[in-house]
Amino acid sequence: MAGKALRQTLLRMAGACDCASLEFHDGRVIAVDNGRRLPIDLTHLPLDPHGYVLTREITFDPPTSPLDENGQGNPYAVYGFGAHLAEVQVDVELGTVRVLRITAAHDVGRAINPTLIEGQVQGGAAQGLGMALMEEFTPGKGENLHDYLIPTVGDIPPVETILIEKCSSVGPFGAKGIGEQAVIPTAPAILNGIHDAIGIRVRKVPATPDRVRAAILALGSPGG
């Protein structure tokens, strides 16, 4: 959209019709209009405050619909989907949980920059691990961050990222977002891994050793 608007600006500067074509040679733009070649020398144009010769800004508001009386609708234009699988190891005597591996599958639309997306997923998995096992803040309690634990590089397991490309009709080049989407599934995946390993359900995060031990004792079978 911005490119089309910039094209129209160039055609107007050259005095060419809308159906003319544009060619670029040695810092000059040439509008070709019914055999006429109409040059525009960009080197003689003043720069804007950002150092550009010509710019155009376009705003695109993707189509959405409000929720109806039943709470149904499309308040967002694009929806991403993701699922995480966590392989964990639980020490039933100490209540400690170690995450061995995370597999993360995400529908990202068109993966324009796969390396950047993988980094986003890995970072989200790290944040989710902290949410699941370490990080806890109680409003009104605690005078500093001394006891607020966060994951270190030694806590982060290998993360296998699976990118699913189901393109969006409104995203740029078919892309979708991958922000909180990488954080949200991690903690549930880890808690499900704990349940699969020893049969307990931890209902409150973080799953600290004392909470895991309490759940084991409540189950009545420390060996799982």
Could you say what each language-model-derived stretch is?
Residues 1-224:
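C-terminal catalytic domains of large/alpha subunits in multi-subunit enzymes
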